[in-house]
């Protein structure tokens, strides 16, 4: 492979789910400086649910997105600052403010069959001169061909990179291969592709490797896998595997290993790992950020979180339907034998 992989770190955005969006500014700066020193290409910064995600529904952040973004932008010298925007949560106004605070990349994220809602945000990002990425979440919930058609929409709005996003950590390796082949068949040769994997079936690194084999340009990963559910593809593990495969990248593996174990892992109040609950996410194809919400609701009502998660999968709930976690719990209580 003759290209250099683009490494997109998501520790400070997806990883925010693992700490209930409670990173302090000092912690964000410390992590960003370590990532910058290790030469990752970009660092995504926002509430776990993207710009303006801080809310009753998704969980309130310890700081505003702009406070985190501005602090990280000032702290880094090599990496570019990225952010995430979900239309319907974040607005064009939020995007402009994030750009003013220092974000130079935006990933505009929609459910995998709803790319049409991203047009306004993608067009605005391009007008601001931002590196503009389309982010198709829950990509396991549609066919490769339908996903490719949604990717085409984002490309037509101005996105220059389209991501296959395995939000539920439910894709197998052949699933990833089929989706990238479908995208490559329809997108312009100059349009890049990216992979955002979750580790709920322990396939985060394997799926990222398959994506690269199919021509993927950008790889999302996080230190110690810090992310929703069982986490993302662990950055240090992916880089070690890439190095063993002889793939080019700009990262310092040892620096990433140190940052993962010395800085990030100690912040986890709940281990980011494959266990009964996070495995249920991948098995049932449930949005990974539902985990902490489901665990809290289960504790409140005397239920098992895994039962709630499996039922959410049966009902095909998607990101943004966090309120349904309580509904499912109440329904499960009603079905209990007196």
From Swiss-Prot:
GO MF term (any one) = 4-hydroxy-2-oxovalerate aldolase activity
Q: Which domain of life is it from?
A: Bacteria
Question: Binding positions for Mn(2+)?
Answer: 14, 196, 198
Q: Which reaction does it catalyse?
A: (S)-4-hydroxy-2-oxopentanoate = acetaldehyde + pyruvate
Keyword GTP-binding annotated: no
Keyword annotations for this protein, in alphabetical order, are: Aromatic hydrocarbons catabolism, Lyase, Manganese, Metal-binding, Plasmid
How would you classify this enzyme at the top EC level?
lyase
Q: Where in the numbering of this chain does the Pyruvate carboxyltransferase domain appear?
A: 5-257
| GO annotation terms (biological process) | catabolic process; L-leucine biosynthetic process
Which residues are annotated as site, described as Transition state stabilizer? 13
The record places the active site at 17 (proton acceptor)
Q: Which of this chain's residues are annotated to bind substrate?
A: 13-14, 167, 196, 287
What Enzyme Commission number(s) does the record list for this chain?
4.1.3.39
Disulfide bridge partners, by residue number: none
Membership in a protein family = Belongs to the 4-hydroxy-2-oxovalerate aldolase family.
- Protein name, entry field: 4-hydroxy-2-oxovalerate aldolase
Originating species: Ralstonia nicotianae (strain ATCC BAA-1114 / GMI1000) (Ralstonia solanacearum)
